[in-house]
Amino acid sequence: MQRTQIVDALAATAPQPVIRLCGWVRTRRDAKGFSFLEINDGSCLANIQAIVDEGIPAYANIGAVSTGAAVDITGELVESPGKGQKWEVRVQTLTLLGAADAETYPLQKKRHSDEFLRSIAHLRARTNKYGAAFRIRSEAAFAIHEFYRERGFFYVHTPILTGSDCEGAGEMFRVTTLPVEGSATPASGNRYENDFFGKECNLTVSGQLEAETLALGLGKVYTFGPTFRAENSNTPRHAAEFWMIEPEVAFADLEEDMNLAEDMTRTVVRRILDRCAADLDLFNRFVDTTLVERLRQIADEPFARCSYTEAIELLLKSGKKFEYPVSFGLDLQTEHERYLAEEHFGKPVIVYNYPKEIKAFYMRLNDDGRTVAAMDVLVPRIGELIGGSQREERLDVLEARINEMGQNLEDYWWYLDLRRFGSVPHAGFGMGFERLLMLLTGITNIRDVIPFPRTPGNLEF
């Protein structure tokens, strides 16, 4: 018999004489002559109640059906006389698919700490909080693909292994087949020419440069995949492995780039509000009681916008004492970003035209010679959600910027070719997917919105 998901069973419009469900037992409660099972299969937040009568043959083994056990049941879907849900199942057959020892199964019917659940990340998807978080993660990923498809973008794949450093920060994971001892260093006698690719190889920090090459042939593209940063930051906002959404648009300027970033953010928020009401309600009740209200504001109201220069002036006039200094030429820190988004504007704000010294070489130099056509989207409770720019399309200016940043022109010969052959204005941005999920759920630690977090000192699973 075909299996029905619990989300569909609970949405039934009429009783069913026979239905088959599979799932994990959340609780078992025994009464005289029968037992109540709460079963969840991950398809939704809600459990379904199954009533097992002592008259069925499988009832003899009901003692083995403990919290965490996997079961396969068939029975009649009937209206539930109790409050809380419309349907329940009167079990006709019950098969124990996988037992779970009640003494050692780590998930019991109580609220576990996030720290404890990170230590059993292989099981935490069975909890209400993390089941909801990962369903929202799935729905958000689908909404992003949907957004770009509706607007004529092509989804492209960029390499994980790379010989270039998009950010120029040098915080990259090295990949090598050379002996680990000494790796490719002069002292070890190992050379990059002896390595697998014959040159230095790293895990990508961004698919942007490669996406630009595809945009300057396909017009509008986006990439959505994993990126890696060997940044030894043990903070709630940083992970060594995370996912990025990176669109690139030919013939676009900074204004179009900012419009796209805002449109994408608001559209995805709107779709999560529409499609994940039950899961959002969980986070609104137990994680952040202002979550849904804040998401509705993001969906409904245009973002604020101000230049970097204006942002610095607002921070200086705020009267607040910040931990990090505020001055033209210094990058905005998280405390500055959050003040602008939370306290001054009270909603997301796009800050644009940053000093060239604090931005990457590929960002277009403005006519003032001091700033670049860069933008960041700052959101309440998080800070930076998106970073983007109009890309530098002028060959001579780009070469000068690469030299200024101490990069090797030869490493970017293919990137410079884009400016030699039919160069056009173009723009793009990167959004950290996990930061978007923190915005959508109210979860404050990036380790809790990705199934298996990779952070300094943590490589389990």
Swiss-Prot record:
Record-linked InterPro entries: Aa-tRNA-synt_II, aa-tRNA-synth_II, aa-tRNA-synth_II/BPL/LPL, Asn-tRNA-ligase, Asp/Asn-tRNA-synth_IIb, NA-bd_OB-fold, NA-bd_OB_tRNA
Superkingdom, taxonomy of origin: Bacteria
Cellular localization per UniProt: Cytoplasm
PROSITE patterns, per the entry: AA_TRNA_LIGASE_II (PS50862)
Pfam families the record matches: tRNA-synt_2 (PF00152), tRNA_anti-codon (PF01336)
Regions annotated as coiled coil: none
GO MF annotations, alphabetized: asparagine-tRNA ligase activity; ATP binding; nucleic acid binding
Protein EC: 6.1.1.22
Keyword Ribonucleoprotein: no
Keyword tags: Aminoacyl-tRNA synthetase, ATP-binding, Cytoplasm, Ligase, Nucleotide-binding, Protein biosynthesis
GO cellular component, one term: cytoplasm
GO biological process, one term: asparaginyl-tRNA aminoacylation
Catalytic activity, as annotated: tRNA(Asn) + L-asparagine + ATP = L-asparaginyl-tRNA(Asn) + AMP + diphosphate + H(+)
Gene3D superfamilies for the chain: Bira Bifunctional Protein, Domain 2, Nucleic acid-binding proteins
Subunit relationships: Homodimer.
NCBIfam families listed in its UniProt record: asnS (TIGR00457), PRK03932.1 (NF003037)
Protein family: Belongs to the class-II aminoacyl-tRNA synthetase family.
PANTHER family: ASPARAGINE--TRNA LIGASE, MITOCHONDRIAL-RELATED (PTHR22594:SF34), ASPARTYL/LYSYL-TRNA SYNTHETASE (PTHR22594)
Protein name as annotated: Asparagine--tRNA ligase
Organism for this UniProt entry: Nitratidesulfovibrio vulgaris (strain ATCC 29579 / DSM 644 / CCUG 34227 / NCIMB 8303 / VKM B-1760 / Hildenborough)
Gene that encodes the chain: asnS
